[in-house]
Amino acid sequence: PLEYCRITAAGLGKLFRQWDTVTVQGAAAEAAGQSPELNGDQIVYDVGEDWLRVRCTPQGEYFYGTLVQNAAAAQWQSMDGKQHRSVETTQTVSMERRVPELDFVTECDNRVWGCNSKENVIYGCKLGDPTNWFSYRGIAADSYAVTVGSDGAFTGAASCMGYALFFKENTLHKLYGSKPSDFQLSSLRCRGVAKNAARSLCVLNETLYYLSPDGVMAWDGSLPTKVSGALDAAKLSNVQSAVGGALDGRYYLHISRESARLLVYDTEKGLWSEEDVCSCDMTSTGGQLYLWD
């Protein structure tokens, strides 16, 4: 089809797949009078071992032809080989699948979700494809992005009960839905995740536990409630790091301030205790809780 452009380079097709969204930079197509649209985000409609095809609307006077580009020049030749022209170039052509800068990530409903504090944006990758974050074809599998209106930096992210959750110190953003056309974002002013406590987030028996600036909180889908009233709140604030884990109905929380503490909350009895073992890290999987220094 004449509204498509075929890009050729050795091994190019091994790096990308059909329906990828790639960002093209450095192409001299506009300077050569071929098309101003080639640079930027492009959908890959077809791919071979050494080539791929993107859509490019015929606009330039020299659109129908072949453009060969290196670091010094770009040579254009008409389809019949009778016309030639050359333009200088200052850069080489690059192609990439862009990934946004993400402060925190979580997985929910076969998508990786992430947040960016500089842009105040929440991103979702293409359905089932964490390599594509800017794929917008108007289908249910599209990538997704939404700007939030709350102040401050993001402090953590987690998934619980089918929701992708993004926290700031005083805000909870809850994102839900099955596809981009019906994704919804609700925001709640509440005690969020404390700074440096993103890893305290831990789901246990359908409840999300985390360390907030005011103590340990539990979220079950409504309002977060404080469960650390029996503890000294001052000793839970201004942490250098906080890591959470779960085992047998107990929430383990390692806190680093001037000294380290390993706190254990029995969620069934509502009781706190403190362990002697103070690991610097932990993870829970397969009915086991692993702690290491």
Which residues does each PLM region occupy?
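Generic recognition of cysteine residues
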Residues: C5, C56, S78-G81, R85, ...
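N-terminal beta-propeller domains
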Residues: R85, E96-K174, R257-Y265
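Beta-sheet-dominated scaffold domains
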Residues: N110-R111, S150-D293
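Predominantly extracellular/luminal cell-surface or secreted proteins
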Residues: Q25-A27, R55-T57, S78, Y123-R137, ...
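Residue-level detection of beta-strand scaffold positions
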Residues: T21, L102, D142-Y144, T207, ...
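Surface-exposed acidic, glycine/proline-enriched linker/cap segments
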Residues: T89-Q91, R137-Y144, A246-R250
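Small/polar beta-strand repeat architecture
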Residues: P1-R98
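Surface-exposed ligand/attachment interfaces on beta-rich extracellular proteins
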Residues: A9, E30-Q34, M95-V99, T147-D151, ...
